[in-house]
A protein has these predicted regions:
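Oxidoreductase cofactor-interface core, primarily capturing Rossmann-like NAD(P)-dependent enzymes
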Residues: 2-47, 62-72, 79-93, 101-112, ...
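Rossmann-fold cofactor-recognition segment
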Residues: 50-63
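Short, functionally important structural connectors and interaction interfaces within domains
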Residues: 53, 189-192, 223, 286, ...
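A general structural signal for well-ordered alpha-helical segments in protein cores
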Residues: 96, 145, 174, 269-276
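A hydrophobic C-terminal alpha-helical subdomain
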Residues: 219, 255-316
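NAD(P)-dinucleotide binding in Rossmann-like oxidoreductases
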Residues: 251-253
Length: 316
C-alpha cells in the first residue's frame, strides 16, 4: 500500500501558493495531500480549499509555535512571505527564520523556499546609483527574502530555493496600467529600458512547485529560477494593445524620474525595475525551458493576456 505524503503550503489562500494547493488537489492519484496553512481558516478561500479536499490549518508566520504545529508530520513544506502584508523586509526575514526552524524541528524531507535576490549584493548601501530605501534596503520586497536564504541553509533542511519573476497578475490590479499620453495614445511607461522582463502567472508558479516536490533528487539544494516568458516593454505594450482594443506604446523612462512619480511605492518599483534593466542577471536566472519541463501547460504572455483579457481593467 502506497503512503500518501503531506505537503504543508504556507499562504495557500493566496495566488501563488494557492496555485500549488490546487495543483496538489487536482492530482488525487499523485500520492500527495495538501495541508493548507492560513491565518484565517474561516475565510472563503480557505473554505473553498477545504471543499476540494485540503486540510486547513491555522498558523501565523510571526508565531513560531503555530508553525511547528502546522508542519508536524509533513513530508514537504512550501515556505513564503509577503512583503505587501507587513511592508517590512526585516519582518519577512524573521518570518523566513521561523519557517526554517519549524521545518527543521518537524523533520521535513523537502522544503521549497520562495526567495528573491538580495539586491544589496550588487548595490551596497553606500552605492548611490540606486537609492537606499528606509530600513537599509534597496528593493525591500526582494532583499528580505534573499536574506532569509541563510536560515534554510543553516538548518540543513533539504531545501529548493525557488526564484520567481514578475507576476503578470499585477496588470489585473492596475500596476503599470497604460495611461493616455499628450497625444491621446495609451502609454506604458516603465524604467525598464530595452531589457527583457521575465514574467509568469501565479498558477504556473504553483504547478512548477508541485513538480519540484515530485523530483527531490534533482532539485534539493538547488536554486531554481522559472519564467513563463521574457518580454520587452514593446512586447508588453503589444499584448496590452489587444486588451485595450487600441494601440499601446512603450515609453522607457529613467528610474530617477519614475521613483518620483506621485503614487505609493514608486521608489520601490523604480529600484526593482532598475535592477532588471541594468543586466544583473535577473533575466538569465529565470529559465522558460526549465519551467516548461516542470509544467508543460506553461503560459506565455500572449496566452495569459488572451485568457485574462476580461480581468484587466481598461478604464484608467
Amino acid at each position: 500500500m502506497s503512503v500518501t505524503k503531506t505537503i504543508a503550503v504556507i499562504g495557500a489562500t493566496g495566488a501563488t501558493a494557492g496555485g500549488l494547493a490546487r495543483a496538489i488537489l487536482s492530482d488525487p492519484e499523485g500520492g500527495y495531500t495538501c495541508r493548507a496553512i492560513t491565518r484565517d481558516p474561516e475565510s472563503a478561500a480557505a473554505r473553498a480549499l477545504s471543499d476540494q479536499g485540503a486540510t486547513v490549518v491555522r498558523a501565523d508566520l510571526d508565531d513560531y509555535d503555530s508553525l511547528m504545529r502546522a508542519f508536524d508530520g509533513a513530508y514537504g513544506v512550501f515556505c513564503m512571505t509577503n512583503y505587501f502584508v507587513t511592508f517590512s523586509a526585516q519582518q519577512e526575514t524573521e518570518q523566513a527564520a521561523n519557517q526554517a526552524r519549524a521545518a527543521e524541528v518537524a523533520g521535513v524531507s523537502h522544503a521549497i523556499w520562495s526567495t528573491a535576490e538580495d539586491t544589496r549584493r550588487w548595490y551596497p548601501l553606500d552605492d548611490d546609483t540606486m537609492p537606499t530605501l528606509p530600513g537599509g534596503y534597496k528593493v525591500p520586497n526582494w532583499d528580505g527574502k534573499g536574506e532569509g536564504d541563510r536560515f534554510f541553509a543553516a538548518t540543513g533542511v533539504p531545501t529548493t530555493y525557488l526564484l520567481t519573476p514578475f507576476h503578470w497578475e499585477a496588470f489585473v490590479f492596475g500596476l503599470g496600467a497604460p495611461q493616455p499620453g499628450p497625444d491621446g495614445v495609451r502609454t506604458l511607461a516603465m524604467p525598464l529600458g530595452e531589457a527583457p522582463l521575465p514574467g509568469i502567472t501565479a498558477e504556473d508558479i504553483g504547478r512548477c512547485a508541485y513538480a519540484i516536490f515530485q523530483d527531490p533528487t534533482r532539485f534539493v539544494g538547488e536554486t531554481v529560477g522559472i519564467a513563463g516568458d521574457h518580454t520587452t516593454g514593446d512586447q508588453l505594450a503589444a499584448g496590452l494593445s489587444d486588451v485595450f482594443g487600441e494601440p499601446v506604446r512603450y515609453q522607457p523612462i529613467p528610474a530617477e524620474i519614475f521613483r518620483n512619480l506621485p503614487f505609493p511605492g514608486a521608489d520601490l518599483a523604480a529600484n526593482m525595475f532598475q535592477f532588471v534593466a541594468e543586466d544583473n542577471g535577473y533575466d538569465s536566472r529565470r529559465d522558460v525551458a526549465l519551467a516548461r519541463s516542470l509544467n508543460p501547460s506553461l503560459a506565455g504572455f500572449a496566452e495569459w493576456v488572451a485568457a485574462t483579457r476580461g480581468r484587466i481593467p481598461v478604464q484608467v
